[in-house]
């Protein structure tokens, strides 16, 4: 955007005055992936001109300055906050069944601990074990696999069959860091770069329902790739200018 979109469509803006900072509270990027993926993401972002600060927690923002835990201030009018999720409190769920972020503790069958006949799957649920003391990663595959296993257990329960405890099958993780740049963690192989980016595109294209929708998305991607332009834009009007 800084290199192609702003100089082309917003001549009144000086793109050289735009700085992009990424402030990460942890000591590495992509903590849910391998060290290789985190290091690759850091290199790609740095190559793109993003100034990355690790171990930096933002504690406040007043509309003009973002303040960190150490007291350092960053002047900015545009702040994107990506600090994770927190579940809403649900009446009837005891506090003893809640973990950090209001995640609900469940057993290996996804039943809420301390509450009978109530189940939770996906991001809202946390299933602890010796191998996973902090629960499963909060990704779509966990939710899908838990939902399928729970549905099968409901059928088994109706037929008086043995219930099956949930066991997560890690199919791998991917993250894209812009054009031609991505990182992929597979159970037996970790790689990055253009091949990883193509794999990310293929997997996400495959997940789209309908042949027509797949073709439309693929065409939009091709246009964006070859023209360095984005077909989707959000126009944000200045409220003060509208009143004037």
What are these regions (language model features)?
Residues 1-56:
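Rossmann-like dinucleotide-binding cores of NAD(P)H-dependent redox enzymes
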Residues 54-65:
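A conserved short coil-to-beta-strand element within the FAD-binding core of flavoproteins
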Residues 151-244:
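C-terminal, flexible cofactor-proximal segment of oxidoreductases
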């Amino acid at each position: 955007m800084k290199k192609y979109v702003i100089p082309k469509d917003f001549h009144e803006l000086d793109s050289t005055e735009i700085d992009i900072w990424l402030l990460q509270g942890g000591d590495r990027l992509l903590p849910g992936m391998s060290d290789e993926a985190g290091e690759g993401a850091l290199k790609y972002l740095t190559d793109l001109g993003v100034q990355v600060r690790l171990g930096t927690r933002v504690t406040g923002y007043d509309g003009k300055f973002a303040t960190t835990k150490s007291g350092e201030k960053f002047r900015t009018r545009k702040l994107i906050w990506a600090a994770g999720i927190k579940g809403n409190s649900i009446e009837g769920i005891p506090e003893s069944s809640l973990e950090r972020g209001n995640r609900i503790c469940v057993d290996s069958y996804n039943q809420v601990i301390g509450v009978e006949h109530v189940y939770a799957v996906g991001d809202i649920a946390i299933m602890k074990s010796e191998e996973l003391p902090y629960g499963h990663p909060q990704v779509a595959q966990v939710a899908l696999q838990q939902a399928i296993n729970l549905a099968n257990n409901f059928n088994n329960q109706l037929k008086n069959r043995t219930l099956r405890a949930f066991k997560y099958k890690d199919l791998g993780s991917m993250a894209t860091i812009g054009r031609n740049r991505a990182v992929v963690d597979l159970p037996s192989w970790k790689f990055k770069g253009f091949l990883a980016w193509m794999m990310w595109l293929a997997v996400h294209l495959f997940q789209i329902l309908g042949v027509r929708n797949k073709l439309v998305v693929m065409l939009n991607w091709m246009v964006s790739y070859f023209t360095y332009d984005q077909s989707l834009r959000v126009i944000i009007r200045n409220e003060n200018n509208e009143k004037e």
